[in-house]
């Protein structure tokens, strides 16, 4: 008998794999640390390859285990990260509101998603470092919202430093994915959305990292 969707163990109802992608230095690791560990660091240590954290949350009476992968933003690592797109159920596209180039590159990251990820993967746009002084802001909130509207995805501005909207971002995409999985359960065999143990083992074997940081 096939196992229920992404729920191989009794301590959770769904296992959801998320990816954090975006240019180096936008604060991906800081967002991950803030959400998973409730911590924040000002040190800048570039993530090497891919690392992940796990946090279990409750949504609508269901226990959701979020497996959140922190990808390196540097171009030389992009061949590593493409292998992880296919298993992702949700992708957080992160840019730095004080760095316009990181915002402009979101379109490139979306093209990568369209090329490598599943067609039905959930996406959310995140403008990080919203705590910075307005004089340093390079990307207006309205511009971020307009880009999100163009692609039909949700948009949040966050601050890993002050914890602004960090919980809201992960809970929002988690809830959307849970709903999609629930809808799929009612229509078809769920094997296509289950992350196999083989896939997880392969991913773990490739992941190498240093201390998580504010840099990615």
From Swiss-Prot:
Gene3D superfamilies for the chain: P-loop containing nucleotide triphosphate hydrolases
Motif range (Effector region): 44-52
The keyword Transport is annotated on this UniProt entry: yes
SMART domains: ARF, RAB, RAN, RAS, RHO
GO BP: abscisic acid-activated signaling pathway involved in stomatal movement; ethylene-activated signaling pathway; protein transport
NCBIfam families attached to this UniProt entry: small_GTP
Protein name as annotated: Ras-related protein RABE1c
Organism: Arabidopsis thaliana
Gene from which the chain derives: RABE1C
């Amino acid at each position: 008998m096939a196992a229920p969707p992404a729920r191989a163990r009794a301590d959770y109802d769904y296992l959801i794999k998320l990816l954090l992608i975006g240019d180096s230095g936008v604060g991906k690791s800081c967002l991950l640390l803030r959400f998973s560990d409730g911590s924040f660091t000002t040190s800048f240590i570039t993530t090497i390859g891919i690392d992940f954290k796990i946090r279990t949350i409750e949504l609508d009476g269901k226990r959701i285990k979020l497996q959140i992968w922190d990808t390196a933003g540097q171009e030389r690592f992009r061949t590593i990260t493409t292998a992880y797109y296919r298993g992702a159920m949700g992708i957080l596209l992160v840019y730095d509101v004080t760095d316009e180039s990181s915002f402009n590159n979101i379109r490139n990251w979306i093209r990568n998603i369209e090329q490598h990820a599943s067609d039905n993967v959930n996406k959310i746009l995140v403008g990080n470092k919203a705590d910075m002084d307005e004089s340093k802001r390079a990307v207006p909130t309205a511009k971020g919202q307009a880009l999100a509207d163009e692609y039909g995805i949700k948009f949040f501005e966050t601050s890993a430093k002050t914890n602004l909207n960090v919980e809201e971002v992960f809970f929002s995409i988690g809830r959307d994915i849970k709903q999609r999985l629930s809808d799929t359960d009612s229509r078809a065999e769920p094997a296509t959305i289950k992350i196999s143990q083989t896939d997880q083992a392969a991913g773990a074997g490739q992941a190498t990292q240093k201390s998580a940081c504010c840099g990615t």
